[in-house]
Amino acid sequence: MPAHIIDGEAVAAKVLNTLKQEVKDLKAKGKTPRLVAVQVGESPASKVYVKNQQKSCEEIGLNYTLDQLPENTDEAGLIQRVQDLNQAQSVTGIILQMPLPQGINARTVQAIIHPLKDVEGMNPANMGRVVYGNPNPGPCTAVGAVELLKSLNVPIQGQDAVVVGHSEIVGKPISLLLLALNATVSTVHVFTKDLASYVKRADILFVAAGKSQAMWLRFQRERQKNPATPAPDISPLIKADMLKPGAVVIDVAINRIPKSIDEKGNPALNEKGRPAIVTVGDVDFEAAKDVASYITPVPGGVGPMTVAMLLKNTVETAKIQFA
């Protein structure tokens, strides 16, 4: 039987509807959460993201402000601006917009954001709360992915859960959140021997490696230095035959890669003569959906939940500040 496709949009919509009412209730008391996104310079790559952030905030009634600093802002200047926002009572949430210019350490600045205004859950104090299974606020993608699993009402306690990827903002916190739910957790990564043997025993599988995009970007860099660089393997990291039949598969990765490449690594072109780019996960979705019991699509799976958790963090931290 084909897998049930997990509709992240639908689950996220339920969260947003609840938040919309909570914001309405706060406003009735004269209290409005305000989210400030701090951006250094103007990044074309983040324009769409910022626009979507603002739209999402407005849909549930949050105030949203883009605080755009000059391109030549240094780390000290950015830290000072964050400290000012920490002190501003009208600001209840702060986002640090990526990418940051060279010379500015994102970790350093994120550690300056007040834990109660850190709606991305990246302050070390908030990351530490994940250890206690109390991510409020917690890293949005990790929390969103686990909330998506919980929405399925499938057994978690005692199940073998495997997390592919150990990044600080996704893989590690997912593992900790699963441990808090009493799953038996294995975390695997680029240095793990025999990845397939771990994946095969997973009742619950989270995949957050971003392998295909990493391979493609590395190829592009190396090709500039050496045109004879061999074409990369940008096929999905997780193949259908690696899965345990009936596994629940949560694909967290977002890979923006060519639809196909030739033997020299040249991408297929679209009708406009430009590289045909697709968005895919780390799992071979079409084949895996015939093996798994539940599976997330990419896009449309974890992505909407990331946005929903960002807004949930914003509302929840505001409620604490208003209390």
Predicted segments — roles?
Residues R107-N123, M127, I250-Q321:
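Rossmann-fold NAD(P)-binding glycine/threonine-rich loop
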Residues P33-G41:
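Short beta-strand segments enriched in small/hydrophobic residues
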Residues G61-N63, D67-G138, D290:
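Phosphate/diphosphate ligand-binding glycine-rich loop within oxidoreductases
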Residues V40-Q54, N136-W216, A228-A253, I257-P267, ...:
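Glycine-rich phosphate/diphosphate-binding loop of Rossmann-like nucleotide-binding domains
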Residues M1-K31:
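Positively charged, low-complexity intrinsically disordered leader regions
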Residues Q97-G103, G210-Q213, I254-I257, G301-V302:
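Short glycine-rich anion-binding loops that position phosphate/pyrophosphate groups of nucleotides
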Residues K24-T32, D84-Q89, N153-I156:
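Glycine-rich phosphate/diphosphate-binding loops that line cofactor/substrate pockets in enzymes
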Residues R218-K225:
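Charged/polar low-complexity intrinsically disordered segments
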